[in-house]
Amino acid sequence: MFGLRLAQASAALALAASAGSALAVGLGPLEKSGITSSERKGLYLTVSNPYRTAHNFRVFVEEDSGIAPGRVTIHPSTATIASGAHRRILVIVDGLFPGEEVNFRLCAERIEERRVTVHARVCSKLGARRLRPAR
């Protein structure tokens, strides 16, 4: 009887531990685009911390996502966010030519201080388009 309860308690603890590590940073909206008449376009996104304690997060352009990372500026690209809190970030796309449209993926993840089993991240699909001059 005691052994059965101990096994149930161990299983519950293992499930709770695995569920806690499977949480992922929040990033929204998951898709956003905008139009500009200048060579720069800014977009606001929100990073959320679903964990029970404050953590450090980073936001970055996904490799091979269709834009050179040097054309994108992220303010801030790293931040400490309190438990259950949100932080707005500004993403600026630079060097847009008239008529050019760029699409890329921007990702957010928790900065891990140790090796973890599940490395969770979330990505948004972003787009920016520059208008052609009127004739």
Q: Each predicted region: which residue ranges?
A:
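Short acidic, flexible loop segments centered on an aromatic residue
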Residues: 50-68, 108-110
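Bacterial N-terminal signal peptides that target proteins for export
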Residues: 1-10
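Beta-sheet-dominated interaction scaffolds and their linkers
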Residues: 23-47, 78
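Intrinsically disordered, low-complexity Pro/Gly/Ser/Thr-rich segments with frequent PxxP/GP/PP motifs
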Residues: 69-99
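Cleavable N-terminal signal peptides
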Residues: 9-12, 22-23
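Terminal connector regions
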Residues: 95-135
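Short, solvent-exposed loop/turn segments enriched in Ser/Thr/Gly
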Residues: 37-44, 87, 99-105
